């Protein structure tokens, strides 16, 4: 009987392997390009590049390639979306639609049935298993961005297209005859935006657990010169209750105390202090027939007297990703064959580990610039060795470096440090200088007569203080608590990605409005929210106007200066088929202020204004678009004086002579005719 069962399991395993292989083969098919490459357009995105910083450093001669483009071609501040958040703006960049058309209004959205936040970029359907063993329904991930990306329209028209690290392309859009590698939005294997691990012997039992934003702190207890622990990976899809699948990890300190040996996933590597490991491949077994793989690497922060190690997030293995991250499916495997193993996580630079002060500024910059250079090499290789008619490549380093180093440009920031500023005050400039070199290299690699367009999705501001919007709503009578005076516990991203509860102290029967995300307020509408109290129509309209007036009049009690620049009603700034999902109110703050982290996650701390004591010190997410513009440069002069990020899609389509894929909100920018490619 046992033998028969074993034989049956082996046959089932072989059948599943054949099915997986068949799915892989189907995903790897690539239709041939139709048109020869006679016209070339290259679009480079540099997330968060600010027009004021660009202009300042270009005038100082520090950005020679970009300055030359501005003089011989064109430079304009680029209008952005409201709110000027990366996913919102890149969705409009790709489709030429405003957020009411794309359906992307923030990183987060709320479920009106539960009031719980969830990621706005994708929706997920869980896998189903028979007896917890046999997958009878695969997991499904749905890209929530509506609209047809311009690179999809171009590829459909027969133009060879290559897209590298494009935000909001998870899962990726099929690009007939072309290639696409998804960027911002791709999760780690844990299903988060990048959970780093920190292993340390100095941690107390009270230190361990989840950090506010994206970290796992693990205490090591030495047994002689050895320590054992686990790496927690993905949620077990076969379990009835919430639990994560783990794999063991071992550390062994050398007798001399100058190195540590790491054993993980069947691989062993010995590292001295202040050194990076190579990539580790880690397999998490779901059941006897199914496992998923990730890659990660370590940095040894200290060996003695305390053992302290940083471990990168669990990136989906680019050679066998459990979820689609590229089109065709084997594109990232081809890149690995050419360029070696690389990160696949959408949030490419580990801002969270620096923000939680588990790595330092130097280590963050080393890793970020190495990652930026890897993307530059891939971009140049595609241009030189497999040139397409359209290439799009979006870099994130300019944004991520700005987020965590803006404090060193702002002596008034609570985390300004003169000593650190002397050492790392040029960190943001360094990211711009690398941007400049990439632009020069790309321009030289392009076909003669091609069109080069450089864009950023938004600019930047210092962020000195956070605004607890839900606390303001409580104090102004728009939200009622079950237990007034009882402060919420601090929330973390694990609550969002895990099994946390939100708004546990809110009395929905007496609440009129609630805040979630980075600047959004929702009315507790009857007929829409599960426990709605507010009647749609005049009652709701009156409340929104009242909230607008009070927020715009609110002053910082320390400075007596206005905090909010402008409050918009959703119906004033959004239009399109996804309007039912839009926030009712969008709050845009003045320079120096932003929605607090805890408001973004749905918490209700005690005070309204809180000092920003984090290294994440620059932001844009709930700023006003009028003073948070991005940049637009091109090697061709442009006549249009007020370009918008919505204009890029129709402009590229027009240059290549492609019919627009339906209505677009953006306009075609007026260029001089491109020179013919010889």
Where are these regions (language model features)?
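A long, amphipathic alpha-helix that forms part
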Residues: 34-36, 52, 365-391, 407-454, ...
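Glycine- and acidic
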Residues: 358-365, 417-428, 532, 633-638
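Secreted, luminal/periplasmic, and some membrane-associated catalytic domains
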Residues: 37-39, 46, 60-61, 71-72, ...
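C-terminal motif of bacterial Sec signal peptides marking the signal peptidase cleavage site
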Residues: 24-27
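Low-complexity, glycine/alanine/valine/leucine- and proline-rich hydrophobic stretches
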Residues: 593-640
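Bacterial N-terminal signal peptides that target proteins for export
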Residues: 2-16
């Amino acid at each position: 009987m046992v033998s028969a069962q074993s034989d049956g399991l082996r046959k089932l395993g072989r059948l599943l392997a054949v099915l997986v292989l068949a799915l892989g083969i189907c995903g790897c098919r690539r239709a041939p390009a139709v048109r020869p490459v006679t016209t070339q357009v290259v679009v480079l995105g540099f997330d968060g590049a600010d027009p004021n910083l660009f202009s300042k450093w270009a005038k100082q001669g520090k950005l020679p390639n970009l300055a030359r483009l501005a003089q011989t071609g064109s430079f304009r501040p680029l209008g952005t979306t409201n709110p000027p958040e990366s996913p919102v703006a890149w969705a409009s960049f790709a489709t030429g639609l405003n957020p009411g058309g794309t359906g992307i209004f923030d990183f987060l959205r709320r479920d009106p049935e539960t009031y719980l936040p969830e990621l706005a970029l994708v929706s997920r359907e869980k896998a189903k298993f028979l007896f917890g063993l046999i997958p009878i329904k695969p997991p499904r991930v749905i890209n929530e961005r509506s609209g047809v990306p311009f690179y999809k329209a171009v590829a459909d028209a027969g133009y060879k297209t290559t897209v590298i690290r494009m935000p909001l392309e998870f899962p990726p859009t099929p690009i007939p005859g072309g290639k696409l590698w998804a960027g911002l939005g791709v999760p780690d294997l844990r299903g988060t935006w990048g959970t780093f691990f920190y292993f340390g012997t100095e941690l107390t039992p009270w230190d361990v657990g989840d950090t506010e934003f994206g970290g796992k702190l693990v205490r090591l207890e030495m047994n002689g010169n050895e320590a054992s622990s686990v790496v927690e990976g993905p949620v077990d899809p076969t379990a009835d209750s919430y639990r994560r699948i783990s794999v063991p990890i071992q550390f062994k300190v050398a007798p001399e105390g100058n190195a540590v040996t790491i054993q993980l996933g069947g691989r062993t590597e010995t590292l001295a202090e202040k050194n990076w490991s190579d990539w580790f491949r880690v397999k998490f077994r779901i059941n006897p027939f199914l496992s998923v793989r990730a890659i990660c690497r370590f940095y040894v922060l200290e060996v003695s007297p305390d053992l302290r190690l940083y471990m990168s997030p669990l990136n989906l293995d680019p050679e066998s990703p459990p979820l689609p991250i590229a089109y065709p499916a084997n594109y990232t495997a081809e890149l690995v064959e050419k360029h070696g193993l690389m990160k696949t996580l959408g949030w490419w630079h580990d801002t969270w580990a620096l923000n939680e002060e588990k790595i330092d500024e130097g280590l963050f910059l080393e890793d970020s610039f190495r990652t930026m250079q890897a993307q530059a090499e891939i971009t140049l290789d595609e241009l030189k060795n497999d040139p397409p008619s359209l290439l799009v490549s979006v870099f994130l380093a300019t944004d991520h470096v700005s987020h965590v180093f803006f404090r060193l440009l702002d002596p008034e920031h609570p985390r300004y440090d003169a000593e650190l500023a002397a050492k790392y005050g040029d960190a943001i400039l360094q990211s711009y200088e690398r941007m400049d070199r990439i632009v020069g290299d790309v321009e030289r690699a392009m076909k003669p007569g091609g069109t080069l367009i450089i864009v950023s999705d938004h600019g930047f501001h210092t962020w000195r203080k956070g605004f607890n919007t839900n606390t303001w709503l409580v104090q102004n009578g728009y939200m009622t608590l079950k237990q007034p005076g009882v402060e919420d516990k601090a929330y973390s991203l694990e609550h969002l990605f895990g099994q946390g509860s939100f708004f546990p102290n809110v009395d929905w029967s007496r609440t009129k409005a609630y805040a979630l995300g980075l600047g959004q307020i929702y009315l507790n509408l009857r007929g829409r929210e599960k426990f709605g109290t507010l009647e749609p129509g005049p009652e709701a309209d009156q409340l929104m106007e009242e909230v607008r007036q009070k927020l715009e009049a609110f002053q910082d009690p320390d400075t007596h200066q206005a905090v909010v620049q402008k409050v918009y009603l959703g119906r004033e700034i959004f239009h399109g088929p996804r309007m039912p999902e839009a926030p009712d109110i969008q709050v845009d703050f003045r320079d120096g202020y932003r929605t607090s982290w805890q408001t973004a996650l749905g918490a209700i701390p005690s005070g309204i204004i809180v000092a920003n004591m984090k290294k994440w010190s620059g932001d844009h997410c709930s700023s006003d678009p009028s003073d948070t513009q991005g940049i637009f440069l091109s090697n061709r002069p442009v006549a249009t004086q007020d370009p918008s990020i919505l204009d890029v899609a129709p402009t590229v389509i027009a240059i290549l002579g492609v019919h627009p894929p339906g209505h677009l909100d953006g306009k075609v920018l007026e260029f001089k005719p491109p020179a013919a490619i010889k």
